[in-house]
């Protein structure tokens, strides 16, 4: 491991954050998204979000890497051919459908769960998988006068679980709501869809220990920050699960990874550094560079 202050401490702290991990884990094959299936799912999602159309017809345009669907004057949606990911955005000004007051976490979370169920999010993934609510955010804005920011939107994220393991990467799904409970935007970024034919077990390798993975993370971080020894590194979390690549990138396997988030503090900036290392040894351990090397500030 390259010499770097805190490297050994960093590895120990990360390893202690991992919690229990299984002794072995399934490497799963993924079905290549078919363009026709991406379009069908996208159009079905648009209709579920839009509700009654008053006779308006969908307009669909297929590009090399994506399919775009419009409901004129209502919404725009995009489906990505490489991954099957989808986004839907309603044509609603941000100043409309605002909350008069904040109803609290429990009510907002309930609204988001209900909206997800109503548009059929759980049915998008295979029956043996789960799409579980993960986190609530509030989108707020303040007026010209010095007043408490108003709650504009409630935003919830959902996490896809495959064989009881979370699939990390971007949020598996997000739902944004206005005060009426209507969806204002939506995203779905799961790698497995109901009926897509994927999910076959390719292998069942042994899982690396958290200590082994943490040492690799520390070594990578030490290499990335070589020459910047005054930088302070603080581990935020260290998790085990599957990893989904970006929505514009194809992916043939779900393989296990350890993923670390590290707070980076220097004299000039504070940022977060995310590193993923393989969760198993052998041919199912691709190397990923999720974050570019840090920029040195003179």
PLM region descriptions:
Residues 274-298:
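Mixed-charge, low-complexity segments
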Residues 89-276, 297-298:
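Segments that shape or occlude catalytic/ligand-binding pockets
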Residues 33, 245, 283-286:
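Intrinsically disordered, low-complexity, compositionally biased regions/tails
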Residues 1-141, 147-148, 152-153, 160-162, ...:
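Preferential activation on post-signal-peptide N-terminal prodomains/segments
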